[in-house]
Structure formats: C-alpha cells, structure tokens
Amino acid sequence: RKGTDMGGIMIDLDDFKSINDVYGHSTGDDALIDAARVMRLALPDTAMLMRFAGDEFIILIKTGDSEEIEDCVRNIRSSLREFNETSGRKYKLSFSIGTSIFRSGMTSDSFLKEMDSNMYIEKNQKHYERHPSVRTVNG
C-alpha cells in the first residue's frame, strides 16, 4: 500500500528475562547491544532504531509501502540468523516482530498499539509452538 510516508516495526526480545536470570545482567546488557546491532545492520538509511522499553525496540521507516517494511523484517530475520550462527555467544537471540503503517486518521497511540498487537500475535504463536498443550480447543 502506498500513500503514507511512515511505517513502523516493533521488536521484542523473546525470553530476555531468561538471559538475565541464567547468565546475569551484564550478559543481558550484551544481549541488548547485540540485538540493536543486529537490527541496525539490517536497516536502510531511511530507518530510525530506538529502544522503546526494557527489551522492546521500535523502528520507524520513511515509507508507507508495506513491501519495503516487509523487506526490512526479512533483512532483520536474516541478520538475526547470521548472528546466532556466527557470534559464538552462549545465548541465542530471538525476536517477535509486529508492523504497522501510519495511515490517515491514526494517532501515534493507535500506531503503537497496532505494532504491539501484531507483535504479540507472533509472540503467542511462538509460545503455542513450544507448548502445544496450552492451546485451547478454539485455537
């Protein structure tokens, strides 16, 4: 879709608390730095990466084209796979990702909520894949 000039990506580090609990907060700090580096390397110059809260990041991209946003997501996932295969770290990073396009009539709050909601859809899918017995009859 075109016609707007901003897209957003919200990224949450999956199981970040476990990294802190198992390896300590210093290693958790390293994981946050590594995560930011993985994202930054995958983004175009038109993107701005920000730490939003705790283990969440937001990326704003000067495009309203959903294909360009999805390209960024694919690049981030590819960069993440490469990091996990080559870093030698004792932890593996995993991201849950949600996107949105800032559309006419949206507020900044609704833009953030849409990214967050889409990110939690992915996070919940990952949880059900790891713990299938938790899934309800209705799905």
What are the residue ranges of the model-derived segments?
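Conserved Rossmann-like nucleotide-binding pocket used by diverse enzymes
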Residues: I9, L60, G98
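PAS and PAS-like sensory/regulatory domains
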Residues: Y91-S96
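Gram-positive cell-envelope targeting signals
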Residues: M10, N138-G139
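Short beta-strand-to-loop capping motifs
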Residues: I59-G64, I101-R103
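Conserved long alpha-helical elements within nucleotide-processing catalytic cores of c-di-GMP signaling
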Residues: R1-G7, D14-P44, M50-G54, I58-I59, ...
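Catalytic-core segments of nucleotide cyclases and related cyclic-nucleotide turnover enzymes
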Residues: D21, E70-R77, R81, S87-G88, ...
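Residues immediately flanking
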Residues: L13, T63, I97
